[in-house]
């Protein structure tokens, strides 16, 4: 997630209730907040498990919340605290707050010329729907979703719901609040009862000309390429990249963090891990 206005480290510390020890210095502000899979230079990220220390410290992230004393890599700032995840979530929740909506279509939503919105459709804040689309009854389009031209979404599908992303702790599951977005490109058709989760901090993207059957689940931060065909009851986990012109037949399951090459065909009931 990009910040509308970059912030300084002292301003960041005002958003976090924990004690933070700052190590390192750079000459530019914090420009966004992102999880490991989508970090860029200038981003704030976090790490709280030794399995990921090297990956996060070696990533593009410039500002890192961490729960361990560690040599400061060149060009980075370490923000040492007891609980990096909760510090990270405090920052997310400062920028992303749930606001109840009492209209079916948010006043600032943008609906293109020739688009048909059927009864009982919900469209959230900062949503853009392109021209000549058909959005069928009972579709829910969550905030911060962008839909291209000539897109068809069939009844009861949900676009841009929160990621299913939690950390197990002694007191129960802690949710990673989602601050990412969803992009549906031109000429996509989405069947009935499909669910496409928004990015945790990045983008979930469905490429131009791709077609979904019914009951498809797409996890957070996943990229589906152009002209793909996804059969009924396919489930694709988060942070996976499906390249262009792939065909995935019914009830296939694809795990997280994978790359599926162009023109791949996945047969029905397959499991890819």
Spans of features found by a protein language model:
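Terminal amphipathic alpha-helical/low-complexity segments used for targeting or macromolecular assembly
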Residues: 1-108, 114, 150, 156-157, ...
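Structural signal for interior beta-strand "rungs" in well-ordered beta-sheet cores
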Residues: 46, 104-273
